[in-house]
Amino acid sequence: MNELQMIRRASRADVPFLRDMLRHAYYWRWGTLDSIPGTRYVAGWGRPGDAGVIALDLGFPVGAAWYRLFRRDAPGYGFVDEETPELTIAVVPSRRGRGFGEQLLSALLDRARSEGYRDVSLSVERDSPALKLYERFGFRGVREEDDTVVMRAELANGRPS
């Protein structure tokens, strides 16, 4: 990243942008944000266990990565267990392929480590180009569901179980 590109922590003020990023993450399946079951990934943002980072280019947000803890009775798509936060990541189409996804993922995994998490999980389409990025960061498949793979990455120096 150059001096005009940066990563910063997400805040409650970023919820509208996180909702926009859900459109980019899920546009292929649902037509409008209100019909996206994924809105659970930002509803009530700021609760314990929520953390995220925003990529900026020339001062404008162009991508986001965040995680949230889910309960067994209300899981996310990549749910593994109640102690493992589930990650969501998206970059606006015009900025893809420029390293933002890698920078976002690196920053968010560093944050998860610093907060003491041992693992993070996610769900990805089997044919998604992002699958290779996740594998480079140590994510491994734990189960397959329809056309998706639930993946988990172990984080060094996380809190013990």
Q: Where are the model-predicted features located?
A:
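Active-site rim helix/loop that mediates acceptor-substrate recognition in acyltransferases
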Residues: 30-58
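Helix-loop element at the rim of GNAT/NAT acetyltransferase active sites that forms part
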Residues: 19-35
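A short beta-loop-alpha structural element at the N-terminal edge
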Residues: 4-20
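Conserved acyl-donor/pantetheine-binding loop and adjacent beta-alpha core of acyl/acetyltransferases
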Residues: 56-89
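Conserved acetyl-CoA-binding loop of GNAT-fold acetyltransferases
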Residues: 135-145
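A short, internal acetyl-CoA/4′-phosphopantetheine-binding micro-motif in the GNAT/acyltransferase core
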Residues: 86-97, 124
